[in-house]
Amino acid sequence: MQFLAHDNFHTLQVKKVRFLHPQQEVFLLAGLLLNIKQFVRAIKERNNVFKIDVFLRSLLYQLPFHLGSCFHDAPRELIPATEPELCAWFSLQTGYAPASTSGRVNLHVPGTKTSRRRIIQRSFASDFSEKLKRFPECLFVSLELFQRLLSTWTKDVERRIFFSCREIPLGSDTLMELANLGEFLRVMVVGEQFHNSRLLSRLAVHCYKIYGEDGFISFWRIANLDHFDCFLTPEEILFSSSVYTEMFV
């Protein structure tokens, strides 16, 4: 498994030179994260015009696609495909739109923000139409009520897209948090504790600190971790609070 910085596109490329068990892949990925400061420094020394922010955003986008298989002990291609609208959400949140695939993992999303927003809007519209089928009486009260319903729904969708699709900020602490995540992933791999509820909660906190609330939700779903019942521990109630972070991280 090779990690390359693409000079022309300023992005991270992950190349698999031979078959690896999912846990081996995550162990190597953890090594990259653990040494991300040195990796970035080496890139700058070789090419001082390299866009590190683009590189980091490409890394943030690709992480959940490569991590999920380890927790399910199965190659990524055997895990259910990620919905296009979720990829569009995550692309807008990370500020990165991959134009190609990485191995057998399809990372492609439309290049323009407008195209990605339209994917999300179509998803909302489809969900709305399904709900109308269940509650058809909403259509027959009055024209005024239906127009108000559509207007309210449209404003709500635009608000959700605007606030939930804001780009994750990159700051001086981003490299540190990525390194912390790498160190923690190595602990999970070495101990083979991928279904330990306390460690999953700590993993969630690490990811939350990197991606923020909306980005974390997309990350967790893309990695296909949102169905783990063991994540719902007593500590999870305090999951996003400073109390939990202080106690367990």
Swiss-Prot record:
The UniProt record lists the F-box-like domain at: 63-67
Q: Name one GO biological process term.
A: viral process
Q: Which InterPro entries match?
A: Virus_P0
Q: Which domain of life is it from?
A: Viruses
Identify one Pfam family in the record.
Answer: Luteo_PO
- SUBUNIT field: Interacts (via F-box-like domain) with host AGO1; this interaction targets AGO1 for degradation, and thereby suppresses the silencing function of the latter. Interacts (via F-box-like domain) with host ASK1 and ASK2 (SKP proteins); these interactions are essential for viral pathogenicity. Part of a SCF P0 complex composed of P0 and the host proteins SKP and CUL1.
Role of this protein: Suppressor of RNA-mediated gene silencing, also known as post-transcriptional gene silencing (PTGS), a mechanism of plant viral defense that limits the accumulation of viral RNAs. The P0 protein suppresses local PTGS using its F-box-like domain to mediate destabilization and degradation of the AGO1 protein.
Q: What is the name of the protein in this document? A: Suppressor of silencing P0
What organism is this sequence from? Turnip yellows virus (isolate FL-1)
